[in-house]
Amino acid sequence: MRVIRDAVLADGRVRDIRLDGERIDAVGTALDGELFVDANADYRVLPGMIDAHVHFRQPGFEHKETWASGSRSAAAGGVTTVVDQPNTAPPTVTGDAVDEKAAHAAADSVVDWGVNGGVTGEWDPASLFDRSLFALGEVFLADSTGDMGIDAALFRDACQRAASEDVVVTVHAEDADRFDTAAKSRSDADAWSAYRTPEAEAAAVERAVEVGTEAGATIHIAHTSTPEGVDAAAAGGATCEATPHHLFLSRDDLDDLGTFGRMNPPLRSDPRREALFERLADGRIDVVATDHAPHTRAEKAADIWDAPSGVPGVETALPLLLGAAHRGELSYERVRDVTAANPADVFGLERKGHIAAGRDADLVLVDPDDAREIHGDDLHSNCEWTPFEGHVGVFPAMTLVRGTTVWDGDTVSAFDGRNVRQ
């Protein structure tokens, strides 16, 4: 058995971590075993990030991303499990479409993975729930990339079906009736934020929680971008996630980002961003997930009403959070909880998310003092850009998936990622 010696855990304790193949055998002091890594009480060791919200674009949009490129980017960013969303081509609204996507993931992903099922008027719940779905969603309450927005009746039906199958429903919560159509006369980059209002999110969260509760479904709100949305989710007993772009960017950044800062839901005012970050720090936000949604530079360079929505983020999420922890803005315990422990608990991943005996050895080693600027040219996504250009992050020195080194600080290694639901 191999030992990581004198690792600093998220809570500051210095412990040995002994690995037995793919699993953690023990966490303690003075553990016997072959020395694997001497952390020397300098390196922090965290459980690998579970990114419950990525768009790896395959099948259908491989020029933007593939399972190979997206999972390499994940590994280099300390992400050991990814969950792909349904809006590919074909969308994963049938069992056959899930099988097709899962085959790509099984062949090419170097991290563990899950596939979500989607809901449209053409969905086939019988075949869909016959597959090993990670969750149902994101279910779109307003149109986004892929035109998968659904009406209230179909959402209610989807919640009832998911409840009967004991599958979590993840929700893209925006109410199109609350969009400000007056903003459509504008052509500046901020027009998108003005159009898709904060009120649209809060109203949709309240509606989603109400319908989900009536149906007996477990509701998780995706990419919550406003403090009001977080509060509405909590009030209704739902869990929620926030993204790095909503935590670290605001409408103030749109002068520099232009259409590269268009996403759904959009960037909010800086006071709202600060209030969202406060909810991250104090525990009201359950999960950080990236909504990694890459597009090419050429695609994003269109005008604000034609540019596709979405930004990459799977490689920079954990580094940005670790940078915030290094600056004292966030505790390492919160980083651990929102990136690993909580996603594992919310989605029932019994082998993931915790550094404990019997869990998968999904681990990230970081030197907390090794902060550096983020540059798109250094990242591994096919899209080759980042909205966080020039921001400071702390990147992993090593990433392990089930005990195998998939990132050594310089190179991504081959590895057969597995479906976490099988």
From Swiss-Prot:
Its cofactor is Zn(2+). Zn(2+) 1 binds at residues 53, 55, 138, 291. Coiled coil: none annotated. Keywords: Hydrolase, Metal-binding, Pyrimidine biosynthesis, Zinc. Binds 2 Zn(2+) ions per subunit. Pathway: Pyrimidine metabolism; UMP biosynthesis via de novo pathway; (S)-dihydroorotate from bicarbonate: step 3/3. One of its GO terms (biological process) is purine nucleobase catabolic process. GO terms for molecular function: allantoinase activity; dihydroorotase activity; zinc ion binding. Zn(2+) 2 binds at residues 138, 172, 223. One of its GO terms (cellular component) is cytoplasm. Substrate binds at residues 55-57, 87, 295. It catalyses: (S)-dihydroorotate + H2O = N-carbamoyl-L-aspartate + H(+). The keyword Hydrolase applies. Belongs to the metallo-dependent hydrolases superfamily. DHOase family. Class I DHOase subfamily. This is Dihydroorotase. It comes from Halobacterium salinarum (strain ATCC 700922 / JCM 11081 / NRC-1). The gene is pyrC.
